[in-house]
């Protein structure tokens, strides 16, 4: 199993960050790799809620909420995808800090394909995933600080 940790600061109230995280469809606004996100079913929040994400340049993933602390933390897991993983799950937390918000995430996953998957993870996947999440968190912070919900420039 591989773990990836992130911590960033947003110069805005924590509730602004939480509003973006708690709206499961808002990921399409701050994640540059998501073309469109939609809640599946009637449940829009809390443990058991699901969202599907159409990805750029192609692909689709379905995620399920596994952890919910209103105003503070949301955890998700990949429920369906064609990625070469046995599982991927994460918890993102928001805490007040110095007049702003500290955002932390702990993500863990297991790559398929035994020793070959382990090697692929060490050589490519962890580095690529970390870089992707760096971009996601930078965009999340920009959106939270500006209060914007518009799509990143150049997105369709």
Regions found by a protein language model. Name each.
Residues 7-11, 38, 52-54, 64, ...:
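Generic structural detector for well-ordered beta-strands
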Residues 14, 66-71, 93-102:
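A short, structured loop/turn motif at beta-sheet edges
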Residues 1-40, 139, 155-156:
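Hydrophobic ligand-binding cavity/cleft-lining segments
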Residues 49-56, 75-81:
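Short beta-strand segments that buttress and anchor functional surface loops
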Residues 142-156:
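Generic C-terminal helix-cap and adjacent flexible tail
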Residues 3-5, 59-63, 86-90:
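Short, surface-exposed coil-to-beta transition loops
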Residues 80-134, 151-152:
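Beta-strand/loop substructures that line and gate deep hydrophobic ligand-binding cavities in soluble
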Residues 57-61, 67-74, 84:
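Short, charged/polar surface micro-motifs in flexible loops or helix N-caps
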